[in-house]
């Protein structure tokens, strides 16, 4: 950031700054790719959660959930890719693409469980997997469909690879039964939603995938 003269949180909100910071990270050999965005709150914020932009040191994070109960999921906003930080990301990818760099462009996506537990209060969300299983599946389907739209828009903007990070979707948190039922199912749905776009995909889940 200091070398580029571009810092957080400003780079989270401005497509030129986001693009140029990502490019600077590549050119200064911090990464072997050029990837945006720099946080995991874009999707949750677009669906109604409150997010603080953090600081030069700390990433943006959720400070208020859109709803407390999974029963309210039908009231959620759909992802509007024409405004807010979702648009900032898409515009940043277009800027990076226009530079014709000899590096893959990475579009970063937050995984279904992590988005779901950033939109609805996490402990209530996890409890609902057992108490209101059917509604959670309806909610997860909605969340995953919205993420697919965002991923495909990033590809259209110029992303070569989509990286899906789902740190809340671990076996340690959910247990093996719910990991299979809610993580594997909806990660696969997400991958199926972008598989015809002829781009690479990477899934990152903290912990053991079992």
Annotate the PLM regions:
Residues 1, 32, 59, 80-210:
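Active-site loop segments of alpha/beta catalytic cores
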Residues 1-55, 91, 95, 138, ...:
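N-terminal basic, low-complexity leaders that serve as flexible interaction/assembly modules and, when applicable
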Residues 1-8, 48-50, 70-73, 112, ...:
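Generic secondary-structure boundary/loop-capping signal
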Residues 9-13, 61-64, 76-87:
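Short coil/turn segments at secondary-structure boundaries
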Residues 21-24, 65-70, 135-140, 193-195:
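Short C-terminal domain-edge/linker segments immediately following a structured domain
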Residues 40-79, 95, 102:
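A contiguous, low-structure linker/loop signature
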């Amino acid at each position: 950031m200091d070398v580029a003269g571009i810092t957080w949180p400003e780079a989270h909100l401005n497509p030129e700054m986001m693009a140029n910071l990502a490019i600077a990270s590549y050119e200064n050999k911090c990464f072997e790719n050029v990837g945006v965005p720099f946080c995991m709150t874009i999707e949750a914020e677009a669906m109604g959660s409150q997010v603080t932009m953090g600081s030069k040191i700390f990433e943006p994070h959720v400070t208020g959930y859109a709803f407390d109960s999974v029963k309210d999921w039908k009231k959620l906003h759909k992802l509007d890719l024409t405004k807010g930080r979702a648009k900032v990301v898409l515009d940043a990818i277009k800027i990076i693409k226009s530079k014709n760099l000899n590096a893959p462009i990475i579009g970063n996506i937050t995984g279904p469980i992590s988005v779901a537990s950033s939109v609805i209060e996490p402990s209530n969300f996890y409890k609902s997997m057992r108490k209101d299983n059917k509604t959670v599946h309806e909610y997860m389907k909605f969340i995953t469909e919205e993420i697919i739209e965002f991923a495909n828009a990033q590809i259209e903007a110029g992303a070569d690879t989509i990286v899906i990070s789902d740190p809340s979707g671990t076996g340690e948190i959910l247990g093996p039964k719910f990991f299979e039922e809610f993580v594997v199912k909806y990660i696969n749905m997400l991958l199926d939603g972008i598989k015809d776009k002829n781009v690479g995909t990477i899934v990152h889940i903290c912990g053991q995938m079992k």
